[in-house]
Amino acid sequence: DLGAVESELDELVQLQATHKSRCDVLQQLVETKEGYGSGAQVVLAKCDEALGSLADKIKVDEPYVKAVEAALGSNLQLVLTEQPEAARDILNGLTEREEGCASIAALDLIASRNGHFAPDCDPIAGQPALSVLSVEDRFMPLAKALLERTFIVNDLAQATEAWRAAAGKFDFVTLAGETLDNRGVYTGGKQNGNGADSLLGRRNEIAELDVQLG
């Protein structure tokens, strides 16, 4: 009847408003770099030489967000610039103005890197972390430098078995965001691999909400 139709319409309108509000909040968090260190926030907001952060430049499908965030850790906040000279100028400015600390990746320098990890075999289990990333070619050398020895596994038991078989040649990260690095160090606990606290998850959720909002 008409009452039921009106009620359903009201629910749809309310749901749309909720989605729009959530999307706006997430977009603001992305733009203001909420969750970044103060130095990185300053650089990304004020420096023309800054091309964005690493988190801005990579896309990861939802099943792998926790794993990639755990593998990259604070490197997600890396500020990207082209030249080493720009990186030095940015850091000098932060020091002079006492505006915090930041880590800067100079893409030109990284592109000339020759020390690529070249194991003689692959681990007995795991998916290369690089295979779940979408990233522009210009940023791929940096992604390789950070993740070329990292493999995604189901759990720490599988990570341990693969680590032993390879005698510590690789880093492993689980879908839940736990890690076992090449030194044999385990790291785990509560992870934020989705939602507003996740630097990668925010963008995924915004994309999903945009689809729902039409």
Which residue stretches match the model-derived regions?
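Repeat-solenoid scaffold signature
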Residues: 1-13, 17
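Hinge-like oligomerization/junction regions that interrupt long coiled-coil arms in large cytoskeletal
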Residues: 11, 17-214
